[in-house]
Amino acid sequence: MPTTQKTLMFLSGFLTSLGSVVVICSILGTQAWITSKIFFTDTISNGTIAITYGLFRGTSSQDLNEGLQELDKNFEVLGILSNSSQKSLHVVVIILLILSLAASLLSSMFTFYNSISNPYQTFLGPMGVYTWNGLSASFVFLTMVLFVGNVDSNHLSEKLSQTLYPDAINKKTTHTYGYSFWLILLVILLNIVTVVIIIFYQKARYHQKQEQRKPVEYAPRDGILF
């Protein structure tokens, strides 16, 4: 059976890993990733289009300076994107986030298993925890980078706008990233905290072993013989 110290520290790691799982599920399920405001003109008027969307769903609204504006629209992101580089990169972003979720799930399983068992010298021990948290943080960081690249360099919002409002001619676009996007940083922080907890446990375990060896190392030779 593991010591009380090990149980408590690995349970703490389990809670932070489970926290990252919950946060990633929230990121996947919410649509407050980004709000893009697009200034446009068309044949009879001009105004702005506001598009708020996440990985799967979004909403758009139109504000015209004059004329009759369209009703707000709900849309499926992948559903209205044609086979394009924007759609391909968006799919990669989703896959990376799902991989990060899987890695965080495995981290939570490994930390919980270590809190009730002693697979210390195998991959099921701290090495496995380090691996899964490193992968989770890497996948979610790539998710952030690729999403920003798809929006800023690949003009994802403009592509969605052109599909929703084909008559509008885009002039200028501004982006505001929402809480769903910034929660990615919380996932990375939770991954780091999990690793730090296990590192502290390993250091404490090493010092305990060193303390246990000292009485034998410094005992008189006669005492050791008899």
Curated annotation (Swiss-Prot):
Position of the signal peptide: none
Segments traversing the membrane: 8-28, 92-112, 128-148, 181-201
Recorded topology in the membrane: Multi-pass membrane protein
Family annotation (InterPro entries): Clarin
Subcellular location field: Membrane
Superkingdom as given in the UniProt entry: Eukaryota
Keyword Transport: no
Family indicated by similarity: Belongs to the clarin family.
Protein name stated in the entry: Clarin-3
Native source species: Rattus norvegicus (Rat)
